[in-house]
């Protein structure tokens, strides 16, 4: 049992994992997507209300068209093959990011998944796709200014984010052996505890998740206070 309300994961290391195993980048990304399916039972067992996965950043658009096209295709395949199982297990799906950059057919697929699962309450699985936190904050401020407000409060920004109901991040996990948060949930993770692992995401397993949570449980959170 854990008191974590929001677990965020940067799914890093797919391409390096592929290089290590003499595989293509596409095979590495597929292994990363398969890992979500593998870890779903653990996510459900932990009963953490909100889990956000960083799957495709706003910066990822700058990669080769072949890699970008495959990553977009992976999201479509994942929603197509996993949606019924997610729905059956009571998972509410949310997707955040600049989704207008995606094709109309994929946007429709995303909206259908959100609509189908909107009343589920076991856990919320939020997929951050075409997402950048700076962009999210800019979009929120633009929305507020467009509404006619001349002064902006914390509350105004919170309510203008892609998902106003998203709780603050308690624990942010990044596999892959690098130590940065890469423009991910900067607003929501203001007081998050950070956990970094040298293991690549496709090698990550439920015991690694548990190890991160155990490490988190030993920390004394101060939320910027003493």
UniProtKB/Swiss-Prot annotation:
Transmembrane segments: none annotated. It is an enzyme of class 2 (transferase). Binds 2 magnesium ions per subunit. PROSITE patterns: UPP_SYNTHASE. Its cofactor is Mg(2+). CDD domains: Cis_IPPS. Mg(2+) binds at residues 12, 193. The active site is at residues 12, 60. The keyword Ribonucleoprotein does not apply. Its EC number is 2.5.1.-. InterPro entries: UPP_synth-like (IPR001441), UPP_synth-like_CS (IPR018520), UPP_synth-like_sf (IPR036424). GO terms for biological process: polyprenol biosynthetic process. Pfam families: Prenyltransf (PF01255). HAMAP family: ISPT (MF_01139). Catalyzes the condensation of isopentenyl diphosphate (IPP) with allylic pyrophosphates generating different type of terpenoids. Homodimer. This is Isoprenyl transferase. It comes from Rickettsia sibirica (strain ATCC VR-151 / 246).
């Amino acid at each position: 049992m854990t008191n974590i309300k929001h677990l965020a994961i940067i799914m890093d290391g797919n391409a390096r994992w592929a290089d290590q195993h003499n595989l293509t980048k596409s095979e590495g990304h597929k292994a990363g997507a398969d890992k979500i399916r593998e870890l779903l039972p653990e996510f459900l067992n932990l009963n953490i209300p909100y889990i956000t996965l960083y799957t495709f950043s706003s910066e990822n658009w700058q990669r080769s068209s072949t890699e970008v096209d495959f990553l977009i295709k992976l999201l479509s395949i994942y929603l197509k093959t996993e949606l019924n199982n997610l729905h059956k297990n009571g998972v509410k799906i949310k997707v955040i990011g600049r989704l207008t950059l995606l094709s109309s057919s994929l946007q429709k697929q995303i909206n259908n998944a959100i609509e189908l699962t909107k009343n589920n309450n076991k856990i919320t699985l939020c997929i951050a796709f075409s997402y950048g936190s700076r962009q999210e904050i800019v979009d929120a401020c633009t929305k507020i200014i467009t509404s006619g407000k001349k002064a902006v409060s914390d509350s105004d920004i919170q309510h203008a984010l892609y998902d106003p109901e998203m709780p603050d991040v308690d624990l942010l996990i990044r596999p892959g052996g690098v130590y940065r948060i890469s423009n991910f949930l900067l607003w929501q993770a203001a007081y998050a505890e950070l956990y970094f692992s040298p293991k690549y995401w496709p090698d990550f397993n439920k015991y690694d998740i548990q190890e991160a949570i155990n490490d988190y449980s030993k920390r004394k959170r101060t939320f910027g206070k003493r």
